[in-house]
UniProtKB/Swiss-Prot annotation:
Residues that coordinate or bind L-ornithine: 161, 225, 229-230
Record-linked HAMAP family: OTCase
NCBIfam families xref list: orni_carb_tr, PRK00779.1
Similarity comment: Belongs to the aspartate/ornithine carbamoyltransferase superfamily. OTCase family.
Record keywords, A-Z: Amino-acid biosynthesis, Arginine biosynthesis, Cytoplasm, Transferase
Gene: argF
Superkingdom assignment: Bacteria
Protein name: Ornithine carbamoyltransferase
Length: 309
């Protein structure tokens, strides 16, 4: 059987995304109600990038599903030398039930998935962060009810993985997504086009703007992320000056709907992309969002493994 992979947010159809989110809600209520890895069976969890939430949530989640996480710095394997991704994928597929990889280039994940005979999950790449957006959607649903028809505004670096995933995952759920970003930091055109194609089937919309205040006005959900993603620390670009108008502060929050919620995938650079007042304020659901990484990823793994059986 050809495995299902989760490499980008639109790998799930709207109905499939809804199934995963419903299961995530069930697992949050009863963490041990699904045990697809009973045995324990193994899951490879590979890291090319440092991690806190991704590592803890996957390790704990795999254990709660009855399995064993084999956590490895990918650079310490033959991947860090000269073994091909395809050969690594074929070998790991003989040992484990799924492969989770946090890496840089999306094409490496796609090469791994092309050769693997078990599900491959994108735990973060430079282009997408789909597991995080499942957790975001779960948090939004918990606080806002139905997702379809909500208005969400992302502020900041529109060219980063969160902006891309929020577009694709958001419109899949029927959410109207606005990306407010300065010139030179807008989403990749091919991902905007993909999001708009998906939006045609869900009634959602994708809007790009450089006007943060107009973008925030009346929305139900405000989202931001770091202005400097991992690997960009030494790229020589000024990532502060162009982003200051996009800082998620009390002034911008006041423009949103009075019941609007605030999300940040973390880690946060307090005082830069988000203020302490907003991060710790009544609109923030950041800690629910972070917790939901555990539940959403367990649901995703369970859903994928059920289709592998």
């Amino acid at each position: 059987m050809t495995p299902r992979h989760f490499l980008r947010d639109d790998d799930l159809s709207p109905a499939e995304q809804a199934e995963v989110l419903a299961l995530a809600a069930e697992l949050k209520k009863d963490p041990f109600s699904a045990r697809p890895l009973e045995g324990p069976r193994g899951v490879a969890v590979l890291f090319d990038k440092n991690s806190t939430r991704t590592r803890f949530s996957f390790e704990v989640g795999i254990a709660q599903l009855g399995g064993h996480a084999v956590v490895v710095d990918a650079r310490s394997t033959q991947l860090g030398r000269d073994e091909t991704l395809e050969d690594t994928a074929r070998v790991l597929s003989r040992y484990v039930e799924a492969i989770v990889w946090r890496t840089f280039e999306q094409h490496r994940l796609e090469a791994m998935a092309g050769a693997a005979t078990v599900p491959v999950i994108n735990a973060l790449s430079d282009e997408f962060h789909p597991c995080q957006v499942l957790a975001d959607l779960q948090a939004i649903a918990e606080h806002k009810g139905s997702l379809s028809g909500l208005r969400m505004c992302y502020l900041g670096d529109g060219a980063n993985n969160m902006a891309h995933s929020l577009m694709l995952g958001g419109v899949t759920a029927g959410i109207h997504v606005t990306i407010a970003a300065p010139d030179g930091f807008t989403p990749a055109p091919e991902f905007v086009a993909a999001a708009r194609r998906r939006a045609e089937s869900t009634g959602a919309t994708v809007t790009l703007t450089t006007d943060a205040r107009t973008a925030a006005r009346g929305v139900d959900v405000l989202v931001t992320d770091t202005w400097t993603s991992m690997g960009q620390e030494d790229d020589g670009l000024d990532r502060r000056t162009p982003f200051w108008p996009y800082q998620l502060n009390a002034d911008l929050v006041s423009l949103a709907d009075p019941e609007a919620i605030v999300l940040h995938c973390l880690p946060a650079h307090r005082g830069e992309e988000i203020t302490d007042e907003v991060m710790d304020g009544p609109s923030s659901v950041v800690w629910d969002e972070a917790e939901n990484r555990l539940h959403a990823q367990k649901a995703l793994l369970t859903w994928l493994l059920e289709r592998q059986a």
